[in-house]
Amino acid sequence: MAATAHRPTARKRPAGVPTREPVRRRGRVVQWKGYLYALPALIVLAVFLLVPLGQLVQISLFHWDGISVSTWAGVDNYTEIARDPQLRAGFLHSFVLILFFSVIPIALALMLAAVTTRAGRLRGVSVFRAMIFLPQVVAMVVTATAWTAIYAPDGVLNTALRAIGLEAVARPWLGDFSTALPAVGLIGTWLEIGLCLVLFIAGIGQIPAELYEAAKLDGAGAVREFFAVTLPGLRGQITVALTLTVIAALRTFDLVYIATHGGPGNATSLPAYEVYNRAFGTGQVGSACAIAVALTAVILLLTFLITKVQPQEDET
């Protein structure tokens, strides 16, 4: 009787269990589906952001008044930013505004957030928060016009100073070389403090209550509790607030355009205002584009530096 060779039978896979290959294929399909879903947004981004940005860089390399034939300028428009005292002053003014748009609002909002959250359900706290946030929802045209009237020689501020016997202090705040830029900066403080306050109140709500209870058991007072628990717990919110307010300070245009037109002289001239003035006022479109590119680079650099600080702090 001939021996029968028995071939090993392959183990049958239980029903309903897929093989590895279809899983891999399915993963690839899902991955490509994700890219396909994002494709419309990427197309919109390229059409409305990347293409104009490329054209902006291209125009910045030419001398052009917006009408006649352009001539090659190379990097002349960029070197002019370093040579022109007015442009250098404009960038310096932007960094000064960071103090008013970022540092002061964040410091004040931290204190207000700590105080209002400790106040709990006291009557009027929610109304106070809403009033602080109100400038964020008011149109900039309205804000600039209102503050121009407040700062006017016969405005509310000077009238109040004269009423309390400080007539020597009264002045045209937006028309004085020494006070014009700080006056604009204080408007920025009034605008940004509400945004920072909302961020910090939301952040405090995410801090575990056990940390505050442990601090109280250790005998920590309100100040020590703020620095030991609240401030470390708001690192992420502080980073977001700092990023948004720094960008707001550097790209300020409409406030200066309505309130001062860059004056008196160039005391409140800013890069964003110079972009508009050179492109539509003096016909220096190439120079305006170069300033815009430089300003964009500064904003991206500062944003990168601010966001890079947070992970390093979290690791420590």
Region spans (language model):
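Short glycine/proline-rich turn/loop motifs
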Residues: 18-24, 255-258
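A detector for short, charged/polar N-terminal pre-domain segments
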Residues: 22-36
